[in-house]
């Protein structure tokens, strides 16, 4: 019993973590990542694989990773985002749980910053983060993890 519990836990952890280190070549060559936009001199990318956690009714959570990189810098930033969707009230809330500084050449994590007391932000179409939330939702729909709900 304990062995099967350990195996299940290990598989869950492995499914959440990326299968390999992410480096700038992966992002720029679109190996499972999409270019989102350029803002303030930084290029932003999103991982095309997202994790969906079901909630009650039309409520669910999506965990998605985004990355930013600036020109000739040898580091990039990984953001682990949690989007909480409530399709009954048509709201999206967002929290950035963790930020990691990564060596852009090797993919090695240089610094981890966990934010256990990060504040939930309600997203609207004109706020930062909304586009990433909708992109993550569309990736979940495309992967068959969610069904599109129309109000």
Residue ranges, per PLM feature:
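Sec-dependent N-terminal signal peptides
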Residues: 4-17
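N-terminal secretory-pathway/extracellular module detecting exported/lumenal segments
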Residues: 21-82, 86-151
């Amino acid at each position: 019993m304990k062995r099967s519990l350990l195996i299940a836990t290990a598989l869950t952890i492995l499914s959440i973590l990326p299968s390999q280190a992410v480096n700038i070549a992966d992002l720029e060559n679109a190996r499972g990542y999409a270019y989102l936009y350029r803002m303030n001199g930084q290029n932003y990318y999103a991982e095309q694989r997202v994790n969906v956690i079901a909630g009650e009714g039309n409520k669910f959570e999506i965990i998605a990773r985004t990355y930013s990189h600036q020109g000739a810098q040898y580091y990039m930033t990984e953001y682990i985002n949690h989007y909480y969707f409530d399709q009954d009230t048509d709201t999206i809330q967002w929290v950035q749980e963790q930020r990691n500084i990564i060596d852009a050449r090797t993919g090695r994590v240089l610094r981890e910053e966990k934010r256990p007391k990060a504040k939930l932000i309600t997203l609207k179409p004109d706020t930062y983060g909304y586009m990433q939330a909708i992109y993550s939702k569309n990736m979940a729909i495309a992967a068959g993890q969610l069904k599109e709900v129309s109000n």
